[in-house]
Amino acid sequence: MSEILQDVQRKLVFPIDFPSQRKTEKFQQLSLMIGALVACILGFAQQSLKVLLTAYGISCVITLICVLPAYPWYNKQKLRWAQPKIEINVDQYD
């Protein structure tokens, strides 16, 4: 079974489209972790779950504003398409 999965894995190539997407994902994870940490500290200091959830919600919205739009610096490096390893003859299906 392992050999079958390795064969399928060699034939299927799913790279991340842009190297900038890696940076964006790392930025997203880092900002959400910092937001969660700050929210926990604020919530603990105020002894309020409402403050914690509000602070985390604000950090999520800020992260969305920074990460979600297609800013030009996300597309600085051009996309290299993966070349298919399997050739399909579409003429035989006509």
UniProtKB/Swiss-Prot annotation:
Per the record, residues carrying N-acetylserine are S2
Query: A GO term (biological process) for this protein?
Result: protein targeting to ER
**Principal location class:** endoplasmic reticulum
What InterPro entries does UniProt report for this protein, alphabetically?
Spc1/SPCS1
Whether Cell inner membrane counts among this entry's keywords is no
Q: Tell me which UniProt keywords the record has, alphabetically.
A: Acetylation, Endoplasmic reticulum, Membrane, Transmembrane, Transmembrane helix
Return any one Pfam family short name. Answer: SPC12
Q: Between which residues do disulfide bridges form? A: none
Record flagged with keyword Amino-acid biosynthesis: no
Q: Where in the cell is it found?
A: Endoplasmic reticulum membrane
User: Which residues are listed as membrane-spanning?
Assistant: 29-49, 51-71
Q: Hey, which stretches end up on the Cytoplasmic side?
A: 2-28, 72-94
According to Swiss-Prot or TrEMBL, what is its membrane topology? Multi-pass membrane protein
Report the family membership. Belongs to the SPCS1 family.
Q: Provide the assembly information.
A: Component of the signal peptidase complex (SPC) composed of a catalytic subunit SEC11 and three accessory subunits SPC1, SPC2 and SPC3. The complex induces a local thinning of the ER membrane which is used to measure the length of the signal peptide (SP) h-region of protein substrates. This ensures the selectivity of the complex towards h-regions shorter than 18-20 amino acids. SPC associates with the translocon complex. Interacts with SBH1 and SEB2/SBH2.
What's this protein's name?
Answer: Signal peptidase complex subunit 1
Organism the protein comes from: Saccharomyces cerevisiae (strain ATCC 204508 / S288c) (Baker's yeast)
Q: What is the lineage of its organism?
A: Eukaryota, Fungi, Dikarya, Ascomycota, Saccharomycotina
